Amino acid sequence: MELTPGAQQQGINYQELTSGWQDVKSMMLVPEPTRKFPSGPLLTSVRFSNLSPESQQQDVKSLEFTVEPKLQSVKHVKLSSVSLQQTIKSVELAPGSLPQRVKYGEQTPRTNYQIMESSELIPRPGHQFAKYAEMIPQPKYQIPKSANLISIPIYHATESSEMAQGLAYKGIDTVEKSVGLTPKLTGRAKESLGMLLQPDLQVPKFVDLTPMVRDQGSKFLGLTPEKSYQILETMELLSQSRPRVKDVGELYMKPLQQTVEYEGITPELKHYFTEAMGLTAEARIQANEFFGMTPKPTSQATGFAERSPRLCPQNLECVEVISEKRLQGEESVVLIPKSLHHVPDSASGMTPGLGHRVPESVELTSKSGVQVEKTLQLTPKPQHHVGSPGIISGLGHQVPESVNLTCKQWLQMEESLEVPLKQTSQVIGHEESVELTSEARQHREVSMGLTKSKNQSMKSPGTTPGPLGRIVEFMRISPEPLDQVTESARTQLQVAQSEEVILIDVPKVVQSVKVTPGPPFQIVKSVTIPRPTPQMVEYIELTPKLQYVRPSEHHTGPCLQDVKSTKLITKPKHQILETVELTGFQIVKTMLIPGPSLQIVKSEELAPGPIPQVVEPIGVALESGIEAINCVDLLPRPHLQELIVPAELTPSPCTQVKSAELTSPQTSPFEEHTILTHKQGLQAVKSTVIKTEPPKVMETEDLNLGHVCQNRDCQKLTSEELQVGTDFSRFLQSSSTTLISSSVRTASELGGLWDSGIQEVSRALDIKNPGTDILQPEETYIDPTMIQSLTFPLALHNQSSDKTANIVENPCPEILGVDVISKETTKRKQMEELENSLQRHLPQSWRSRSRTFQAESGVQKGLIKSFPGRQHNVWESHAWRQRLPRKYLSTMLMLGNILGTTMERKLCSQTSLAERATADTCQSIQNLFGIPAELMEPSQSLPEKGPVTISQPSVVKNYIQRHTFYHGHKKRMALRIWTRGSTSSIIQQYSGTRVRIKKTNSTFNGISQEVIQHMPVSCAGGQLPVLVKSESSLSIFYDREDLVPMEESEDSQSDSQTRISESQHSLKPNYLSQAKTDFSEQFQLLEDLQLKIAAKLLRSQIPPDVPPPLASGLVLKYPICLQCGRCSGLNCHHKLQTTSGPYLLIYPQLHLVRTPEGHGEVRLHLGFRLRIGKRSQISKYRERDRPVIRRSPISPSQRKAKIYTQASKSPTSTIDLQSGPSQSPAPVQVYIRRGQRSRPDLVEKTKTRAPGHYEFTQVHNLPESDSESTQNEKRAKVRTKKTSDSKYPMKRITKRLRKHRKFYTNSRTTIESPSRELAAHLRRKRIGATQTSTASLKRQPKKPSQPKFMQLLFQSLKRAFQTAHRVIASVGRKPVDGTRPDNLWASKNYYPKQNARDYCLPSSIKRDKRSADKLTPAGSTIKQEDILWGGTVQCRSAQQPRRAYSFQPRPLRLPKPTDSQSGIAFQTASVGQPLRTVQKDSSSRSKKNFYRNETSSQESKNLSTPGTRVQARGRILPGSPVKRTWHRHLKDKLTHKEHNHPSFYRERTPRGPSERTRHNPSWRNHRSPSERSQRSSLERRHHSPSQRSHCSPSRKNHSSPSERSWRSPSQRNHCSPPERSCHSLSERGLHSPSQRSHRGPSQRRHHSPSERSHRSPSERSHRSSSERRHRSPSQRSHRGPSERSHCSPSERRHRSPSQRSHRGPSERRHHSPSKRSHRSPARRSHRSPSERSHHSPSERSHHSPSERRHHSPSERSHCSPSERSHCSPSERRHRSPSERRHHSPSEKSHHSPSERSHHSPSERRRHSPLERSRHSLLERSHRSPSERRSHRSFERSHRRISERSHSPSEKSHLSPLERSRCSPSERRGHSSSGKTCHSPSERSHRSPSGMRQGRTSERSHRSSCERTRHSPSEMRPGRPSGRNHCSPSERSRRSPLKEGLKYSFPGERPSHSLSRDFKNQTTLLGTTHKNPKAGQVWRPEATR
C-alpha cells in the first residue's frame, strides 16, 4: 500500500498527527489510494515534508493549492501530514498541520477520499494519476477531485454508495479517472447537481474532509482535545448540523443526511476524526452557515480553530468542507456554490464576494466564478468549459444565478457582513441559495470563518484574495506554520483549503458542472478549479511568487490575478486564465480538454501549479528544485516522480499557466516557484530536499529522471491519457498546455524535460507548456530561473537534476560547479536527450531568460542563495564541513579564476548566455563570496572599466577579470571586481607578490602607467582603476573592495601572498579550465578557505573586530586614497600622503553566531579596517576591544536576537536556509552563512560595534566583515579619534577639519569618505548581500527584481560613490579642492558641511557619542554610507529616518548623490513615485513636518522599506536578521519589486533616491523626525513583519516569535539598559544601524539638520547634543530626558528616550509583545512617536504600546506573513496599490482590491495567525474568530470596497489612497466600510478596547487611519486593551492598519500603507488634528 505508506506517511504523518486519520485514510484510502496514490501523497507528503517548513507555507501553499485541492490534499495531506507533520513537527504545524491537515483533513478527507477517491480515483489519479493523481490528482484531485470531487462526490456518493463503490469507484475511478469519473461525476454530479450525491459526496467529502479536518484537527488537536470533544461535539453538531443542514438546507439535508449517511461511511473519518470537527464546523458551518450561524461556526470554528487554530481552520475547513460539502452539496449548485464561490468571486469581482472564496472565488471564480464567470464572463468557456453548458447553464444559471446571487450575495454578504447577505443569498436561492447560501454562508462562513481568507481574498481582490487569501493564508501559513500556522495554517490552510476545498469543490462543482463534457470540464473545471487552486497556487506562487509574483506574478498575485488576468487576469480571470490560457488556451480551452487541459494545465499548472508552486515550489522550486521536489520526493521518489511529473508538469503547468498567463507569471511560477520553492520550497524543499538530497537529488534526479522518464513516458502516455482523458491534461497539465499546443511535443518535452529538468521539467514544463505556447517567453523566465537555479540552485538542483542525471557523481560540486553553460549544456543535453523541442526553446529562452533572469537576477540570486542555501545545508554539511580541500590558496585562487573564467566563458559564450552566465557567475560569485547580487550587478552596471580590464588575463582573469570581463556588461565588471582581480592585485601589491599591474596596465593603459608607478597601489588600483575609471570606480572600487576584501579575505584568509601568486598563476589556468566545477569548487574552496581562515583565526583567537596580524597572510592591504577613495596609485592621482597608507585592511573576521537551531556557528566575514597610520591602528585596536565589548553586551542578546531574527525570520525560510542551510546555505547560504551567520555575528558585532557595521557586515559575509572591519578600523580609529566611525568620515572629517588635522582630515576624510563610501558600499554590498541573503530568503520570489534593483541600487551607489568621491575629494582634498568641496558641498552641500554640522555640532557629543558611536558606528557608517550612498537604499531607507535629520543638510549635499543616485534607474524607479511622495513631502514638509515626517517616515518606510529593512536591520539590530530581513526585504521587495516592481522598487528604491530625496530635506526631514521614526516604526514594522515575513515564514515567524522573542528579551534587555544601550545600539541597530547610530550620529546628525529643523531648535540642538549625547549615554540608557522629550515628537517616532524609554518601559513592555515586533513596536513606537508627535505623547505612548503592538501583530504579522506573502502578493499588492497605484494602475487596482483586501485579511489573517497567536491571541480572544473573519471579511471587503471606492483616490494617490485608505476618504471608506469592516473586529476590538466602540468610525478611520492614528484615545483605550486589544483593536485597527500597516509593513504598500496609514494616521492625526489637510496633503505627498 504505497498510499497507505503514502497515506501512512501522510498517515504516518497523519498517524503522527492522527493514526485514526491514517486509518481512516487507510481505511478509506487504504483500498486503492493506499497503493498508488499513496506514493503520490506520500511523495507529496515527503515532498511537502521537505517543503514542510515551507510546506506550511508551501504546505499551505501546497495544501492550499494543488496539493490543497487534492493532490495538495494528498500532497497536502501527505504534505500536510508531512509538511504539517514536519510543520507540526517542525513548526508545530500541528495547528498548521491541522490547518494543512485540516485542509488536509479537508483535503485529506478529500485527499483521503481523494485518496479514497484516489483509492477510487487512484486508479484514475492513482494509476493514471498515481503520478498524476499524486501530483495531478491533486490537480486531478482537484481535477479528479473536481473530478474527484465529482469522484469524491461520486466517491462520496460512492462512499455514500459505499466506500466499496468508492473503491469500486476506484475502478470507476480509473474510468472516471480519465473520464469515467466525470461521467460518474456527471451522473453523480448531476445527481450531485441534484445535490444529493454531490452534497452527499460533498458531505462525505465534507465528512471525509471533516474527518481529515478532524484528523488534522485531532492531529492538530494533537490538539485533539478540541477536536475530540469538538469531534464529539461536532459529531453531535454534525448530527445537529446535518439536521440543521437538513432543516436549513433541504438540499443540504440531503448532503447532511448523506453526510450523516456518509458519516456512516465517513464516520471513520467523521467519528474517527470525529469528522464532527470538520463536520461540526461543517455541520455548524452548514447549520450555522445555513442558519447564518457562520459567526457561530466561525466563532466555533474560530474558537475551535483558534482553540481553535484548527477549528477556525476547521471551520474554515468546515467552511471549506462546507464549501466542499456545499460545493459538493451544492455541486448541484456546485457551480452555484462554485458560482457562489466563484461567482461571488466573480460577482464580487471575486474580491468582495469571495474574499475567501475569492481565491476560490477567484480561483473558484476562476473555476466556478470563472466558470461561472467563465460561464458568465467566460460563460462559454465555463459552460462549454464545464462541458455541460446545460449543467453550466443550470449550474451556469445557478452559477450565474450564483454569480448573481453569490456575487451579489457574496458581495452583499461580504460587503454587508456576508452573513446577512449570505443568508440573503441563502434566502435568495434557498435550495440553490441554501446551497449557494450554504456556500454563501459557507462563504460567509468562509467569509466569516474564511473571512480571513475571504477577507484576505476579498481583501485581495477576492481573486487574489483567494490565492492571496490562500497566500495570505499561505502567508499566514507562513506565519501560521510558525506560530499560528496552526490556526492560520489551519484557518488559512483550511481557509485556503476551504478555498481549495472550494476549489476542489469548484472542481467538484466544475466537475459536477462539467459532467461528461465535464471531464475536460472536470479537467477544465478542475483545471479551472485547479486554476483557482493555481490561483491559490499562483497565489501560493503568489506567496512565494507573491514576492516574486509581485513583479511577475504580481501579475499572478495581483498579476497572478493580473497574470491570471493575463491568464485570467485574476483567477477570477481564471476566465482570463482560461481565457488567456483559454485565450492562449481559451482556445486551448476551447480546445476542449486541452483547453480544460490547459485549464488543467492552468489548473493543474496551477492546481499542480499550487502543487508545483507548492510542487513547483516543489516543482518549480523543483525546477530549481524539482530536485527539491525530487529531493523532497526523493524521499518518496516514486511519488515525487509521479508527483514530480505532475509537480514538474505542474511546475510546468504552473509556469505554463503563468507563462501561458504570462511569461512573467511563467517567470513568476519559476521565480515564484523557484522563489517560492526557494522561499518555501527551496528553503523547505531545497533545504530539506537538497539538504536531504544533493545525493538524493542525484538519486532522485536519476530516479526522478528515471521516474521522470517514466513520468515522461507517463507524461507521454499521459499525453495519450490526456487524450485518453483529462488525466494527461491533469497529469501533464503543463504537458496539457503544451499538449494543447502539442500533446506529443508536450509529452516528449514534458517527458524530455522531466529528465533534464525535473528541474527543468518545472522549467521545461514551464517552458514546455508555455514553451509551446509561451515556451520561449516562459523559457526565458524559466531559463533565468533555470539559470538561476542552474547557476546555483539549479547548479545545485538542476545540476543535481541535470548533473545528477548527467553527473550524478558530482551532485553537490557539480551542482555548484556546473556552469550555467554546463548546466545549460547539461540541461540542453538532457533537453536534447529528453526533448529537443524544449531544448530549442530552452537554450534560446535560457539565454533569453538569462537576460530576463538577469533582471531576475535577484530572483536568481535569491533562488541561488536560497537554493544554494539549501544545497549548502547538504553541501555545507558535506562539502563545507566534510570536504575541506587543503589547497585553499590554489583552490580559492582557482575559485576566483574559475569564477572569472566561468563568468568570462559565460559572458563570452553568448550575450544572452554571457549575460546569463554573467548573472550566474555573478550569482555564483555572490553566492560563493557572499557578495550581494546588488553589488555584483551595480558592479556590472559599472562597466565603464570593463572593456579595458577584460584584456588582462591574469589579474583581470584572476579577479579583475570579473570587472574587466564586463566590457559592456556591467555584470562582468562587477564579477571581476568581486572576484579576486582586486584581491590578487591588492594582495600581490601589498604582499609584494608580483604585481600583475602590467596586465592591468594593459587593461588600464593610462592608469596602468600610474599603476606601474604605484606598483603596490597599481595592483589594487589595477583593479580599482577599472572601478575608478569611471566615477563609479568608487562604487566598483568598493564593490571591488568588497569583492576583493571578500575574496581577499578568502584570499587573504588563506595566504594572501601565496594565494595571490597562486591566484594569479593558478587562477589563470584554472580560471579558464575550471569554469564549471569552479562554482562547486569555489564554493568548497570558499568554504574551505573560510574554514581554514576560521581555524586560523580561532587558533589565533583574534577578535573579530581586530584584523589578524599582517604577517598572517590573512590580511589584505588595500591602498586607498582617502581623497578619492580609490585604490591608491591606480586611479588615484593624488599624491600618496604616506607610503604606507592609508589602506584598507581587508581581513577575515570570525563571528560566533548562534544559529536559529541554537547551535553556535563560527561565521567568517570580511572585516574592513581603514588604517591611516598607526594611530588608526591604535584606534583600531581600541575599537577591537570596543566592538568586542559591545559585542558582548549586544552580542548575546542580539546575537540571539539576530540569530533569532534569522531563525525567526528564516527558520522556515531560514530554517531551510539557516537551520538547515544555516550550516550549509550554499553560496547564498554560504553568503547567508557568512552573511546571515556572519550577520548575527556582525550584527552582534555590529550591534556591538555599530548598526552600520552589522549593516555593513551584513551586506557581505566576507565584505561585511571586511567592510565591518574597515569600518571597525575606521570606527576604531574614529572612535579612538571620534567614536563615530560611520559618522567619523563626515563628523570626524569635519571634526578633524575643525581640528585642522589636514592630513588626517584629508586623508581621514578621504579615507573615511572612501571608507565610508567603501563602508557604505561595502555595507551596501553587505546590505545588498544581506538583502540578497535576506532577500534571497525573502526575495526568492522576488529575485527577478533584484537585478534591476541592484543595477539601480548600484547605479545609485555608483553615483553616490562618485559624489562621495567628489565629496571625499572635496573633503579629503578640502585644502586641495577648495572649489570642489564647494561644488561638492554645493552639490552635496551638506555632505561635508552638514557633516560638519552634524559632525561638528555634536563634536563634544561625538565624544559623548563615542560610546554611542560604539553603539552607532555602524549606523554612523551607514550614515556615511547613506551620506556616501545618499542613503542609497538601506541607508536611504533605514538610516535616513534618522539620517533624515542629519541628512537634511545631507539631503542637500546628498541631493546630488541622492539625485545622482536618484538619477539612477534604481532610484528613478524608486524615486519616481516615492520621490513624489518625497517631493510632496518636501512640499508639504513645512506644513506637515511631523505629518510629513510621519508621512515621510511612513512613506520613507514605505519607500524605505529597504531602508526600513535597514532600519529594521538596525532596529532589529539583530539587524543582521533585520539586515538580512532588510536584504530579504530588499530582495523580497525586489522580488516584490518584481511583483510590485515599479512600486516596490520605487518604494524601495525610492529609498535610494526618493528616500534620498526624502532623505533630502523632505525625506530626511520627513523621515528624520517622523519618517525616521515612522520608518523606524514602519521599517521596523516592515522589517519585523515584512522582513520577518520577507525573511521567510519561519524567519518571519521566527522573527515574529524568535525575533519577537529575542527582541522581546533581547530587545527588552536592550530596552533595559542593555537594550537601551543596545537600543541605542541595538535599537539603533534594531531601528537600524543607521537609525541606531543615526539616531546616535545620524539621528543626532539627522536630528541636527532635519530633525533639528523638525524638532525645535532646542530639540534639534538638544537632539544634536542631547540626543547625540543622550544617544550615546541617554540614548543608550534612556536617550536622555530632553532627548526623550525632544525625541518625543521626532525621535519618539524614532526611538528616542521616549521610544527608548518607551521601549524601555512601554516598548520594553511592548517589546515582549511589541518588541517582538520590536521593529513593529519600534516602528510602531516610531510611527507612534511620529504619530505620537502627531498624536501626542500619550498617543505616542498609546502608539508606543498599542501601535507598537499594534504594529507588532499587525505589522509583524502583517508584515511577516503579509509582507512576506503580501510583499509577495500583498506587498506586491500593497505596494501594488501603494506603489502600483503610485507606480502603476495595476498595482493600484491590485493593490487596492487585492492588496488591500488581501493584505488586510491576509495579513490580518496571516499575521493574524502568527500574530494572532502571539499578539492576536489576545486579539483573537478579543476579536472573535468570526469577528476576525468578519473583520477580515469586512476589512477585506471594506478595504476592498474602501480601496476600491478609494481605488481612484488610492490610485490617484497611492500613498494618498492608501492614505486614503488610511486617510479620510478611505478612512471614510474604511470608516464606512472600515467601520463596517472593522465593525466586527473593531467592534469586538472596540468592545474589548472599550473606547473603540464609539470609535467605530474613528476606528474605521483609525482602522485605516487608526493605525495611523492610533490616537491617544484609540491607543489609550487600545493601550489597556490596545496592547492586548491593540492586538484585537489593533487588529481591527490593524485590520485597516493591517491594511494600511499591513500594507505598510509587508511592503512598500505596507509602507505606503503605513505611509498612507501613517500618513493617514498622520493624516488622521492630521485628519484628527489636521484631517483634511493632512489626509489630503499627505496624500499628495504620498502620491508625490
From Swiss-Prot:
**What GO cellular component term, any one, is given?**
nucleus
Q: Where is the signal peptide?
A: none
| Disulphide bridges, residue numbers | none
The sequence repeat boundaries are 1593-1600, 1601-1608, 1609-1616, 1641-1648, 1649-1656, 1657-1664, 1681-1688, 1689-1696, 1697-1704, 1705-1712, 1713-1720, 1721-1728, 1729-1736, 1737-1744, 1745-1752, 1753-1760, 1761-1768, 1769-1776, 1777-1784, 1785-1792, 1793-1800, 1801-1808, 1848-1855, 1864-1871, 1880-1887, 1921-1928, 1929-1935
Q: In which tissues is it expressed?
A: Expressed in sperm (at protein level).
Q: Spans of biased composition, class Basic residues?
A: 1636-1647, 1668-1679, 1692-1727
Name assigned to this protein: Spermatogenesis-associated protein 31H1
Its taxonomic path starts at: Eukaryota, Metazoa, Chordata, Craniata, Vertebrata
Q: What is the gene called?
A: SPATA31H1
